[in-house]
């Protein structure tokens, strides 16, 4: 009888943990909203480019307007880390059958004290899954950006960017784009390119990104 009771308790605990996990998938509601918004914009008959990643992508509100000759979908979700993108890869990227995808992750990972090697491993898994699903897909890794509020982590961000760059050198159809140094004035961070929180960019900041990324977006 005691054994039966123990099994019952364990079973209830397992069900409770499982139910909690099902109810707390990070960003599930936000991702669903992103999908609904982009589904209403997406023309499946046209070539598609997807920009995805954390809030630096999400807040790029005029992304499509900057590239009017391309169909560009923005599936960025604020506060995300590379593991979150990996979890939602099907809905945020593969669903739209893109020929190119631009990824910005790693910024929040470093802030949350994840080591660069761990972020790189997750990024490699993202790339592997994307290439497995769409072998001809072109993938562009956008470097971690500098910012006022996270400037003290610059050493870790620079190490992460070097790892991204080396990964891109090793794999076909994978490019690395550096936005770090264009956002500096010499060795100093430009402070006129951020909004008041010191983390996210204003229009001038996105002007820099546009100039750096334009050739990758517009390349056939």
Predicted regions and their residues:
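Catalytic His-Asp segment of secreted/periplasmic serine-dependent ester chemistry enzymes
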Residues: 148-220
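A generic secondary-structure signal
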Residues: 37-40, 88-95, 129-130, 216
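Oxyanion-hole/transition-state-stabilizing segment in secreted/luminal serine hydrolases
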Residues: 56-66, 71-73, 82-120, 140, ...
């Amino acid at each position: 009888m005691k054994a039966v009771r123990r099994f019952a308790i364990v079973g209830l605990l397992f069900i409770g943990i499982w139910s909690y996990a099902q109810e707390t998938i990070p960003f599930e509601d936000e991702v669903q909203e992103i999908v609904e918004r982009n589904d209403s914009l997406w023309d499946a008959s046209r070539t598609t480019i997807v920009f995805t990643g954390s809030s630096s992508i999400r807040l790029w509100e005029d992304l499509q307007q900057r590239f009017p000759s391309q169909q560009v979908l923005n599936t960025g979700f604020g506060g995300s880390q590379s593991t979150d993108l990996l979890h939602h890869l099907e809905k945020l990227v593969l669903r739209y059958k893109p020929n190119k995808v631009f990824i910005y992750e790693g910024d929040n990972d470093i802030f949350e004290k994840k080591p660069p090697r761990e972020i790189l491993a997750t990024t490699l898994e993202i790339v592997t899954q994307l290439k497995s699903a769409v072998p001809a897909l072109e993938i562009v890794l956008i470097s971690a950006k500098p910012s006022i509020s996270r400037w003290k982590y610059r050493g870790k961000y620079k190490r992460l960017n070097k790892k991204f760059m080396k990964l891109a050198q090793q794999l076909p159809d994978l490019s690395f784009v550096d936005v770090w140094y264009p956002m500096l004035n010499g060795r100093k961070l430009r402070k006129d390119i951020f909004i008041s929180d010191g983390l996210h960019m204003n229009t001038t900041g996105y002007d820099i990104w546009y100039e750096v990324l334009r050739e990758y977006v517009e390349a056939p």
